[in-house]
Regions:
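Feature for long, exposed domains in two main contexts
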Residues: 342-574
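Repetitive helical segments and hydrophobic/amphipathic motifs
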Residues: 26-27
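Cellulosome-associated attachment modules in secreted, modular CAZymes
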Residues: 371, 483, 567-627
Length: 627
């Protein structure tokens, strides 16, 4: 089905009902969703040895960073070198920097060896969007007296592995030399041994300060090696050394050391390596061109990041310089930032009180399906595929892709043939994309089933074709032909029959009245006219198709019956008082006379030609009466 915005609902008999249902869908969807995306950050925060005000300014700038074309507060922060005493300070700084965002610290563990060797790993996440599964946490010894932490986060409302992020936050052994590289490799092996036990196809993030010096270092290659936990590098596996690759570097934003490490910006120590499912464009997935070394403009190789002007924010030198100064004073690493697409949030609605419904009719019971995930840019919403099926009482439905609200996708259902009287039914909508929040709905409804109308030219049986003949003298003016239409077998469990359109008329034939009539137990009357003026003697006929519909309810069906009208002119003396030309003087003609009552010179109802239709003409009419 094709998705449609709210203002494109077609005009139909159920527009009001559809608008109400759509409004419910939108309100329910927005009420159940928080405006969020997953901006993921890792940053070696250097034991808080930097300027706390500068650290706060960096956090502020992270939330305002619109270099990818949009800005959003970080949803996941993976921090290194966090001491036991620094943890609370970091929480306070973050709360001041990005107020109103409910941040939660995930399981935090620190051993005495970690506290004395640079600090531990800390994970902070948005609790309105994500939740930690504490049982998924694990400490993995990875050398240099430090542990790598494994955390398990799930997007709220999801119940499958596609909604889970496995995050390994690490700080591998520092310094060059083969012995240090070997310690890093052993640590990477320990992490991979753990990751390879996770469910196949898991969303895995390896993030932190790797301290690797090149793309040929064994620890780096270990993360990329074959196996269930294999990772890919968002920046590719080519060399990152030298000025040509300055845009990739993360350490150090300072030349001078002091309480922080100096040396200039010439190393790529900080990484987010991702498992293949995080590149597939489904569920959690890296958004193209969003992986970046925060504040690095690529023009500060082996110098301080605030040397001269910085151009990280294109065309905004002052803003870029302000960030560069904050990065310089905050830490001896700069953050790595990446933005992820997020799985959908399914929402759908079906009118729960359908009222009267034509069984076996058209598919006009509509379920509306949408993705209620509120993202700051549509590109951040992963496709939300779904399937919608009826329970057998309702039939129809199908598969589709749910668009972001306020647009919606539609699936149509009909009431199965043969259902009359009160009924209950349901539609099951289930997400088929991975990681979707609120992935299943069982939409219940009820109504009153009715049979389709049965149009007929006869009241005793179904007759859908007939011929009606009339005779008239020449130049008798307009004659009328009355044809009854029946709704055979009507009862309170059968639809009324609405007479809508008469097509095919022409050549002097026209419909005078009867269209718009709703036929139930009593027949409706179609009155056709034929203008005999100027017609030669002979037979005139026309084939007419009557389009009728069931009453204006879900399942409304269109019906067609056909009629041949034949008028023969000549060879018949006019019958005085027969105003409708049917050869009889009866109540129909009396009605025409009364309708012309009053001054009416030249009217056929003025039988005594005195210019007035009055009691004298009524007396003559009764004298001509044939019954």
């Amino acid at each position: 089905m094709r998705s449609r915005p709210l203002d494109s609902i077609p005009s139909s008999s159920t527009v009001l009902q559809r608008l109400v249902v759509t409004s419910v869908l939108i309100v329910a969807g927005f009420a159940s969703s928080t405006t969020a995306q997953v901006r993921m950050v890792n940053w070696n925060i250097a034991r808080l040895n930097g300027d706390p005000q500068a650290i706060e300014e960096v956090f502020v700038a992270m939330a305002d960073d619109d270099v990818p074309g949009f800005a959003t507060a970080p949803a996941v922060l993976i921090l290194q070198e966090v001491t036991n005493s620094a943890r609370v300070s970091i929480e306070n700084i973050l709360g001041d920097a990005i107020p109103g965002v409910p941040y939660q610290t995930a399981t935090f563990t620190i051993e005495s060896t970690e506290n004395g060797s640079g600090g531990a790993q800390m994970l902070v996440y948005r609790s309105d969007l994500l939740e930690e599964i504490p049982a998924g946490h694990r400490d993995i010894p990875t050398g240099a007296g430090r542990n790598t932490d494994r955390w398990q986060l799930r997007i709220r409302g999801s119940d499958d592995d596609g909604g889970v992020l496995w995050i390994y936050g690490m700080h591998l052994k520092a310094s060059s030399g083969s012995s240090n590289a070997e310690i890093r490799r052993i640590g990477a092996v320990a992490i991979r041994n753990d990751a390879d036990t996770l469910p196949v196809g898991s969303n895995i993030v390896y993030a932190g300060d790797f301290n690797v010096y090149g793309n040929d270092e064994p620890a780096y290659l270990e993360f990329l090696s074959a196996g269930p936990g294999r990772a890919e590098d968002p920046l590719g596996t080519e060399s990152w050394s030298g000025a040509f690759n300055a845009i990739k570097h993360t350490q150090s934003p300072r030349l001078e050391g002091g309480s922080l490490v100096g040396g200039g910006l010439d190393d790529r120590f900080d990484f987010q390596l991702l498992s293949p499912p995080l590149f597939d464009g489904d569920g959690f997935s890296l958004m193209p061109a969003t992986y970046r070394s925060f504040g690095n403009d690529g023009d500060h190789y082996n110098v301080a990041i605030n040397t001269g002007n910085n151009t990280y924010f294109p065309g905004q030198t002052a803003r870029s310089n302000g960030l560069a100064d904050a990065l310089h004073d905050a830490s001896d690493h700069i953050p790595v930032v990446a933005d992820l697409m997020v799985p959908g949030l399914l929402t759908c609605v079906l009118d729960d009180n359908l009222g009267r419904v034509v069984s076996g009719g058209t598919s006009s019971i509509i379920a509306l399906i949408a993705n209620a995930r509120q993202v700051v840019t549509p590109e951040a919403a992963s496709p939300l595929e779904y399937s919608a099926v009826g329970d057998g009482v309702l039939v129809g439905g199908g598969d589709g892709v749910a668009p972001l609200l306020p647009s919606f996708d539609t699936q149509s259902f009909s009431l199965v043939a043969g259902v009359t009287g009160e009924f209950t039914a349901s539609v099951e909508v289930a997400a088929t994309s991975a990681g979707v929040s609120q992935p299943e709905y069982d939409l219940a409804c009820s109504g009153f089933g009715i049979r389709p109308a049965v149009p007929s030219w006869s009241g005793g049986s179904v007759v859908t074709e007939t011929t009606v003949e009339a005779e008239s003298p020449a130049d008798a003016g307009v004659i009328f032909i009355d044809v009854p239409v029946h709704n055979v077998g009507w009862s309170d469990v059968q639809s009324a029959l609405d007479l809508d359109v008469a097509s095919g008329l022409g050549g002097g034939f026209f419909v005078w009245e009867g269209l718009g009539t709703s036929v139930e137990g009593e027949p409706g009357l179609l009155r056709f006219g034929f203008n005999t003026a100027g017609r030669s003697e002979g037979a005139y006929e026309v084939d007419v198709t009557i389009q009728a519909t069931d009453e204006d309810v879900p399942g409304e069906t269109t019906h067609y019956i056909s009629l041949t009208l034949v008028v023969t002119i000549g060879g018949v003396d006019p019958v005085p008082g027969d105003f409708n030309g049917d050869g009889l003087v009866n109540g129909a003609d009396l009605g025409l006379l009364l309708g012309a009552w009053g001054p009416c010179r030249g009217c056929p109802e003025d039988l005594n030609d005195d210019g007035v239709v009055n009691g004298a003409d009524l007396g003559l009419e009764l004298g001509f009466w044939t019954g």
